[in-house]
Design a protein with these regions (language model features):
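A positively charged, amphipathic N-terminal helix/segment that binds anionic biomolecules
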Residues: 1-92
Length: 92
């Protein structure tokens, strides 16, 4: 199998993995401050860092959604590299 065919397969798989993760993610970091009793979400809003309070009952889900975003971002970076390689091979 040619290199470009392998890359196209990888591109398709990564696209499917990304699409599967788009339904529930949360951009930012959910953390528990030692000085506070609850969790906070730190994220960027219009270029500024904002800290939002996370209720105790939704903290586990918010943490999971934040982790999901990090995985999603890694997949997007991998897809970008594959797309770059395909672009270079097609232009030869």
């Amino acid at each position: 199998m040619k290199r470009i065919d392998l890359l196209r397969k990888q591109q398709t798989r990564l696209g499917e993995d990304i699409a599967a993760m788009l339904d529930s993610f949360l951009i930012g970091t959910v953390a528990k401050s030692p000085s506070m009793s609850g969790h906070n979400l730190t994220t960027k809003v219009e270029g500024k860092t904002v800290t939002l309070y996370v209720r105790k009952d939704i903290a586990p889900m918010a943490i999971e959604m934040s982790i999901r975003y990090k995985k999603l971002w890694t997949l997007i970076q991998k897809l970008s590299k594959v797309n770059w390689e395909i672009l270079n091979l097609e232009s030869k």
